[in-house]
Amino acid sequence: MNWILTMSLTACLHHTWFIKPIPFQSLIINKACHARISPRIVAALIATESGFNRNAVRYEKRVNDYSVGLMQIRMGTAKMLGYTGSLRKLKLPWVNIYYGTRYLKNCLVRYPNNWDGIVAYNQGRPLWDDERNRYILPNGRPQHYANIVQGKLLKITSPSY
């Protein structure tokens, strides 16, 4: 079983979320547990994607779309998940985290390696590399993004954060 999904059950049942408060903590816990994803992973992803900046906006040239809000969700991705609102509304933290966690859950279920799912959240569908026996980013680089998220995860769950 996917350890991120298993970790979510433990975190949501035992309320072992964060050692210190983080921005949007209750919202992250609520939406992550609803999607059955570890709140810690969602928080690490938000720290990586937007640095907890609810107004973050980035133009994605390769797909001609904007990534917005805490989880840097693209309008096209949100629409794929059933979103019908405006770009402005998608930046609202509760809306952004709701659609971001839904998309992350899809990625984690689709890819057998947790970190491949994390990479898929950021890069879109990764490519399978038979030589490495794992997924790689579309541009051929190793999964540096997953390492960044993992580093943020360690930071937000350590007492010195």
Predicted regions and their residues:
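Sec-dependent signal peptide recognition
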Residues: 1-8
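Catalytic glycan-binding domains that act on GlcNAc-containing polysaccharides
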Residues: 12-161
